[in-house]
Amino acid sequence: LNTSGSDAVFTPSAALDHFREYRIQIGTGITDLSGNFLDGSSETSFETLGNVVISPADPEGMILISGGRFMMGADSQTDSDAEANEGPVHSVTLKSPFFISDHEVTVGEYKACVDAGECSQPGSGTYSDNLSLPVNKVSWVQANEFAQWKTSQASKTYRLCTSAEWEYAARAGTTTPWSFPEDANPQDYAWYDSNNKVPYGTGPKRVKTKLPNAFGLYDVHGNLREWVQDFSSDDYSADANGVTDPKGPLQSDNRVTRGGYYSESRKKMRSSHREPKTETTKYVGVGIRICRRPLMGIFFNTI
């Protein structure tokens, strides 16, 4: 255990077993470089998936995922559905842990921000009375308003996920087009054009009604597309030799949405697929998933 600034960093002294649950308890008396100390014991748990460490969702549904390395994107050599802006496949290193929500922001969650006067209304005709539906027809600007409001409500920093964080979490350790097993029925994991018809009706469905991926995230494939921080790019050629903590180009006419939505085909739901839209667009198939920076606590060095 090492303290640096206001963070306590746990580095295993030996390799951890994969697919195991571990518990860590820190006793009183540990002091960081600023002189802050624990006045009581602290305990956390996590499980390992490959070289990735995750912690169970907190009461808000936020899941802590360690940093790690993965192959981002897709190309026609490995995926016949790959589009030009998904390649080349390249190595990405995420150095820091981050929280990501296990669900898309709901109408109820977004309505609280609207009622507080900090978020503007979604596009007309989409603001359902069903508070457990994911909020849709919100722009990238509105998604950021929501994250900023969440930050103002607690001593926690909420934000949109980077595109790399999103894909890392959506893939959940897989290298296949979707994060569910290849022999699984996609309809068990996603709302998309094959199961969002009569008698189900059309439109987004209540969050967390399908199976989650291996990291515990629901609806990363289908239901709604999700805004991420990044400006869009024509491809990943600038990152072809590998990159650490990428945040996309510095400027572009569009932002990126990920994940596919309820009336799109399976190929649009692939983990690597990304769709550009202007940041003021309020599209019926786009919603929000948020990330959060960890507070002082246990960080996991796995790379």
How should these model regions be labeled?
Residues 2-4:
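Blade-terminus and WD-like Trp-Asp/Gly-His loop motifs, strongest in beta-propeller folds
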Residues 8-9, 16-18, 23-53:
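Acidic, Ser/Thr/Gly/Pro-rich low-complexity segments and short DxT(G/T)-type signature motifs
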Residues 30, 46, 65, 70-72, ...:
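Bulky hydrophobic/aromatic "packing anchor" residues in well-ordered structure
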Residues 52-67, 71-72:
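GGW-centered surface loops in extracellular recognition modules
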Residues 72-81, 92-185, 229-237, 292-296:
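Active-site microenvironments of metalloenzymes and redox enzymes
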Residues 78-92, 174, 182, 203, ...:
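Surface-exposed recognition segments
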Residues 96, 187-221, 248-251, 275-280:
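Short, well-ordered junction/capping motifs at the entry into regular secondary structure
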